[in-house]
Amino acid sequence: MATAMDWLPWSLLLFSLICETSAFYVPGVAPINFHQNDPVEIKAVKLTSSRTQLPYEYYSLPFCQPSKITYKAENLGEVLRGDRIVNTPFQVLMNSEKKCEVLCSQSNKPVTLTVEQSRLVAERITEDYYVHLIADNLPVATRLELYSNRDSDDKKKEKDVQFEHGYRLGFTDVNKIYLHNHLSFILYYHREDMEEDQEHTYRVVRFEVIPQSIRLEDLKADEKSSCTLPEGTNSSPQEIDPTKENQLYFTYSVHWEESDIKWASRWDTYLTMSDVQIHWFSIINSVVVVFFLSGILSMIIIRTLRKDIANYNKEDDIEDTMEESGWKLVHGDVFRPPQYPMILSSLLGSGIQLFCMILIVIFVAMLGMLSPSSRGALMTTACFLFMFMGVFGGFSAGRLYRTLKGHRWKKGAFCTATLYPGVVFGICFVLNCFIWGKHSSGAVPFPTMVALLCMWFGISLPLVYLGYYFGFRKQPYDNPVRTNQIPRQIPEQRWYMNRFVGILMAGILPFGAMFIELFFIFSAIWENQFYYLFGFLFLVFIILVVSCSQISIVMVYFQLCAEDYRWWWRNFLVSGGSAFYVLVYAIFYFVNKLDIVEFIPSLLYFGYTALMVLSFWLLTGTIGFYAAYMFVRKIYAAVKID
């Protein structure tokens, strides 16, 4: 094993490369060149709220509709995310200004919301919903200007410009509810270099919106659907009274600005919203701490093991050595098959399947191949990869099951293919029923659910059987010592050798390596933020693998020194101890970061958190188990057994 100083140069090199790739991405779609006055279509994606975690499609609210509603054909990831991309009546032409235009106005008459529609709109506003639109596949953002210096002199104020995804549906003030019924679109274009005799073309590079609430009496509309906005701040906001009908105008304006931003870097606005400096320093701190702690643990184990092996291999002192307590005394029982070997091998096979899927997804995303402009690509790739990685999960499970003296390989293969996926599908189906009851677009449609079942039983299950068949036929792992026929009596264990204490101790270091990254992941999942720091995530994943492996080795070493040879299940459970801290952090995040108070959103949060914790336990438990298994085989192969 290498020490921390041996790892440090390579770590710095890897970190420098990852810092370069963390902000790199392949755009994913070809650029669209627009000519002057070409139509730029604005589409709606969905409505989201971090308070309810229930997305809704755009026309679930009484917005103005075009003459023909057309939904975009979506991939698997978009459907699972709750996206329902649909056209809107906004008429936007390239580099053509619009001061004010009225939507869905007939003969200069305002829109009338019924009592039921008013109640629904008011409810969505109080639930803090955001509206998400796209133009040329670029999501709309609301500019926020924050001042870090509160000095009265405006010249001394430092302005920090940030962007918020989407725009707020409305706002509340003194128990009154107001709707943002006017949208001021600001689109930025980049002029492409052309030959002298060719017409200029433009590319959309940023899409902003300024939402406003303007009451009916302050808007002046004519029969040509044009309108006049009130000057300055003389207007009052458009109130929505949920107890009666409400009349209002839906209006919008369009403003174009030329920008130096090139099309290839137009997503930088959305991918640099988080405080990157804090993120970098936290990651560097985790890297340094974990590698040095891992180096210290490695040196302790190496020195202790060298001393033990040297003592055990001295022929003159062999009798004295056997009278002492130590890990060699359990050599005849250390490879004794555990209880429920089929379930253990099945869980480890699913862990291998998860490990391969996560490693490939993070690596491919780090290289920039899963662009945010390719909506749903990340989730679609993850789903298909998990299905196809079943062959590796089945192979590893089959070989381990044979090593543990198992004989019913067909039943073992079925268990591997259905145990973990069945739990995931069951939980998701129950949660989906609640989402269906709320008429949310986040509910997986029945055809998509059937397609997922077909992928499970048509791709994953046959591949697991195939891998399991070849793994079971392959030569089992060669254990260096024979197993005694009569099990050795296990002495009474100290309190700190308790399984739960081991879980708490073993989970601290791996969780400490990743909890900062976990905050950004939770923000992306539960607060509708973009996550694209996959370079850092890849580095954290490598650190997680190293720390899980070394902690697992330390824990199994101390267990064997205590003459407890029942390490198979214990090591799998203890190595996944960081999942317990993930659960604790999820509860902390729910209480302190989210404003969820209703039952169904809370159920969704903890249901998906349970899936996350289960998957993380399988992942880290599998990593630790195989590291410990290799370690145990190595140390018992290094000593002389009579």
Swiss-Prot record:
<feature type="topological domain" description="Cytoplasmic">
    <location>
        <begin position="620"/>
        <end position="642"/>
    </location>
</feature>
<keyword id="KW-1133">Transmembrane helix</keyword>
<keyword id="KW-0333">Golgi apparatus</keyword>
<dbReference type="GO" id="GO:0007155">
    <property type="term" value="P:cell adhesion"/>
</dbReference>
<dbReference type="GO" id="GO:0005794">
    <property type="term" value="C:Golgi apparatus"/>
</dbReference>
<dbReference type="GO" id="GO:2000010">
    <property type="term" value="P:positive regulation of protein localization to cell surface"/>
</dbReference>
<feature type="modified residue" description="Phosphotyrosine">
    <location>
        <position position="312"/>
    </location>
</feature>
<keyword id="KW-0597">Phosphoprotein</keyword>
<feature type="topological domain" description="Extracellular">
    <location>
        <begin position="592"/>
        <end position="598"/>
    </location>
</feature>
<dbReference type="GO" id="GO:0070863">
    <property type="term" value="P:positive regulation of protein exit from endoplasmic reticulum"/>
</dbReference>
<feature type="transmembrane region" description="Helical">
    <location>
        <begin position="417"/>
        <end position="437"/>
    </location>
</feature>
<feature type="transmembrane region" description="Helical">
    <location>
        <begin position="450"/>
        <end position="470"/>
    </location>
</feature>
<keyword id="KW-0732">Signal</keyword>
<protein>
    <recommendedName>
        <fullName>Transmembrane 9 superfamily member 4</fullName>
    </recommendedName>
</protein>
<dbReference type="GO" id="GO:0001666">
    <property type="term" value="P:response to hypoxia"/>
</dbReference>
<feature type="topological domain" description="Extracellular">
    <location>
        <begin position="523"/>
        <end position="535"/>
    </location>
</feature>
<comment type="similarity">
    <text>Belongs to the nonaspanin (TM9SF) (TC 9.A.2) family.</text>
</comment>
<dbReference type="Pfam" id="PF02990">
    <property type="entry name" value="EMP70"/>
</dbReference>
<dbReference type="GO" id="GO:0070072">
    <property type="term" value="P:vacuolar proton-transporting V-type ATPase complex assembly"/>
</dbReference>
<feature type="transmembrane region" description="Helical">
    <location>
        <begin position="282"/>
        <end position="302"/>
    </location>
</feature>
<dbReference type="GO" id="GO:0051453">
    <property type="term" value="P:regulation of intracellular pH"/>
</dbReference>
<feature type="transmembrane region" description="Helical">
    <location>
        <begin position="536"/>
        <end position="556"/>
    </location>
</feature>
<dbReference type="InterPro" id="IPR004240">
    <property type="entry name" value="EMP70"/>
</dbReference>
<feature type="topological domain" description="Extracellular">
    <location>
        <begin position="24"/>
        <end position="281"/>
    </location>
</feature>
<dbReference type="GO" id="GO:0016020">
    <property type="term" value="C:membrane"/>
</dbReference>
<dbReference type="GO" id="GO:0005769">
    <property type="term" value="C:early endosome"/>
</dbReference>
<feature type="transmembrane region" description="Helical">
    <location>
        <begin position="599"/>
        <end position="619"/>
    </location>
</feature>
<comment type="function">
    <text>Associates with proteins harboring glycine-rich transmembrane domains and ensures their efficient localization to the cell surface.</text>
</comment>
<feature type="topological domain" description="Cytoplasmic">
    <location>
        <begin position="398"/>
        <end position="416"/>
    </location>
</feature>
<dbReference type="GO" id="GO:0072657">
    <property type="term" value="P:protein localization to membrane"/>
</dbReference>
<feature type="topological domain" description="Extracellular">
    <location>
        <begin position="438"/>
        <end position="449"/>
    </location>
</feature>
<feature type="transmembrane region" description="Helical">
    <location>
        <begin position="502"/>
        <end position="522"/>
    </location>
</feature>
<feature type="transmembrane region" description="Helical">
    <location>
        <begin position="571"/>
        <end position="591"/>
    </location>
</feature>
<feature type="transmembrane region" description="Helical">
    <location>
        <begin position="347"/>
        <end position="367"/>
    </location>
</feature>
<feature type="transmembrane region" description="Helical">
    <location>
        <begin position="377"/>
        <end position="397"/>
    </location>
</feature>
<feature type="topological domain" description="Cytoplasmic">
    <location>
        <begin position="471"/>
        <end position="501"/>
    </location>
</feature>
<feature type="topological domain" description="Cytoplasmic">
    <location>
        <begin position="557"/>
        <end position="570"/>
    </location>
</feature>
<dbReference type="GO" id="GO:0006909">
    <property type="term" value="P:phagocytosis"/>
</dbReference>
<feature type="signal peptide">
    <location>
        <begin position="1"/>
        <end position="23"/>
    </location>
</feature>
<feature type="topological domain" description="Cytoplasmic">
    <location>
        <begin position="303"/>
        <end position="346"/>
    </location>
</feature>
<keyword id="KW-0812">Transmembrane</keyword>
<keyword id="KW-0472">Membrane</keyword>
